[in-house]
Amino acid sequence: EMCIRDSCGGVYPLGSDEIATKLSSVRALNEAKEKGQDLVTLCSACHHVIKRVNDDMRNVEDIRTRANNYMQLDEPYAGETNVLHYLEVLRDRVGFDELKKKVVNPLKGRKIGAYYGCLLLRPSTVLAFDDPENPQIIEDFIRAIGAEPVVYPYRNECCGGYISLKEKEMSGRMSCNIVDSAAGAGAEMLITACPLCMYNLNKSGSGKIPVYYFTELLAEALGVKEEALK
């Protein structure tokens, strides 16, 4: 097990000639490769950026060559590392049935809306995370910790993302629509797997229901003491 503290780069650059922004992701990917390990992240934005950069390093020769020329690694990196979101680890490695057996404090009676946003699901051909139109992984997670998932229309819509830095009013409207949609469908709270989404929904949303990170409820369901989280 290895902890990588490098930045993912923050945003996946859309310009085909933009290499420098991708190098921090390549560095993290190469570290995992050298250790012979998968790269697991808790953050949807990091997962999105790193997995797309990894796909570039596997499939786009020009980007791979230029990135390796910049990095000057002992051995060129060519996309060998497997990139996973922690939710994928829970689903595919641990298994939600096994997770359910470990729950000591089932969250019975709680009606929870899953907020996916856009970074976890798209582009689906690269991320291959879940069905981009009708994802189920977070709902399955909610069931595993003993709560009731609430499906609502805006769960896959963008929260405003990085435009919250410049267009606060627009981002606020987008976040409010999401929170209002979930509350209107009967959700008592929202969970997300993206720190930026959590920030936008809490700061710019309507405030009708609270928004939590999925790991907060996981810790509660597993009976993790609050002191252990500090």
Language-model-derived ranges and their functions:
Residues M170-E188:
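A short, acidic, amphipathic alpha-helical segment used as a generic capping/interface helix at domain edges
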Residues L121-E169:
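Redox- and metal-dependent alpha/beta enzyme cores, enriched for Fe-S-associated oxidoreductases
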Residues G15-Q37, S171-C176:
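Short, structured active-site "lid" loops
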Residues M2-I4:
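Short, small-residue-biased leader/transition segments that mark boundaries at the very start
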Residues C43, A193-C194, T215:
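Helix N-cap/beta->alpha junction signal
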Residues V94-I112, G117-L120, T215-K230:
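C-terminal capping/extension of enzyme domains
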Residues D38-E61:
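A basic- and aromatic-enriched beta-loop-alpha substructure that forms the phosphate/nucleotide-
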Residues N69-R93, G207-K230:
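Short, flexible loop segments at boundaries between secondary-structure elements
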